[in-house]
Design a protein with these regions (language model features):
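Exported/periplasmic cell-wall-interacting domains
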Residues: 1-18, 47, 54, 59-66, ...
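Cell wall/extracellular polymer interaction/catalysis modules
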Residues: 5-98
Length: 190
């Protein structure tokens, strides 16, 4: 006769204790950054330069503190003015678009800067370009002479464009009007 098989030695069941872990609290979705509302910018100084002729410009940053830059363009007066912290630091005679290719009115942020830009449409140099619109309207250097016009851009004397290019940043505002000029004490939205 055979002897009964030896019982197998199976380990006894072991109780497993769960290790407590901290479950992070649900993360709320990120909130969008607050959108800044442009602050009104008071005009504190206008350059005392008299009438500007085609090709002329003025630039004076002496004793002007740092501050936000706002560029205004008056198509009726054919002038561009540069304000830093409310002080006019530059002004120039401009060229602008024709009836067929008009310069748009409104407030535009500078979206791109390119010191050596060449138009992909007209194969023309556009030195010191400050791009304003997706379809290519820009402020740029050119020969500013009576009888000339642009295809919608704002042309300024090239030497002035270089100074403006050094002062302006992407995001700075360019306000284009037809017949609205600013005087000391007035405000504009930057």
């Amino acid at each position: 006769m055979r002897s009964p098989p030896e019982p197998r030695t199976t380990p006894a069941p072991v109780a497993v204790t769960a290790i407590p872990r901290t479950i992070p609290a649900p993360v709320s979705p990120p909130k969008p950054a607050p959108v800044s509302t442009p602050e009104p910018l008071a005009i504190k100084r206008v350059l005392d330069i008299g009438p500007i002729k085609f090709g002329d410009y003025a630039w004076d940053t002496k004793n002007v503190p740092a501050g936000p830059v706002v560029i205004t363009v008056d198509l009726a007066a054919q002038t561009l003015s540069v304000f830093r912290g409310g002080y006019e630091i530059g002004a120039a005679a401009i060229l602008y678009g024709t009836d067929d290719k008009p310069t748009p009115l409104g407030s535009f942020p500078i979206t791109m800067k390119d010191a050596d830009h060449v138009s992909s449409i007209y194969d023309a140099p556009m030195p010191y370009t400050l791009r304003l619109t997706d379809d290519g309207v820009s402020v740029h250097g050119t020969e500013v002479a009576w009888g000339y016009a642009t295809h919608g851009c704002i042309g300024v004397p090239t030497a002035f464009a270089k100074l403006l290019f050094g002062e302006a940043k992407v995001g700075d505002r360019v306000i284009i009007t037809r017949g609205k000029s600013l005087a000391t004490g007035e405000t504009l939205i930057g």
